[in-house]
Amino acid sequence: MSISLKALKKSPWVFHVNTGACNNCDIEILDCLTPRFDVERFGVVLVGSVRHADVLLISGPLTQNCLPRLRRVYDAAPKPIKVVAFGACGCKCGIFRDAYNTVGPIDKFIPVDAYIPGCPPKPETIISGIVKVLNSL
């Protein structure tokens, strides 16, 4: 295992992308950062720039307006990057599957390494999913 992959397992930096969600999943991400759940005990840090990220955490159904933005974000991310789709909408478009402006699930456009289902997923589930992705390295 290379040195960079070992470092990634110990302190992953996560960048969140919302592709048209209702905001419930975003609130659960914030819950992960509170002292009750303390995702930082695993070395996970939420970053403000995709250029610093090791993991992309994507929520929401992919809309026509967000598709070009998601592609730009994915292309700007340093490789290798792990992609996690979370929430019912992030995994398979949820209740917005047949909406006029939904183009399809995220894995139709970029490769996804893990799925965290739920509407919204609980903070424990989000943390467990991220840790499992990192343990798969």
Over which residues does each language-model region extend?
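Iron-sulfur-associated redox domains of electron-transfer enzymes in respiratory
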Residues: 1-137
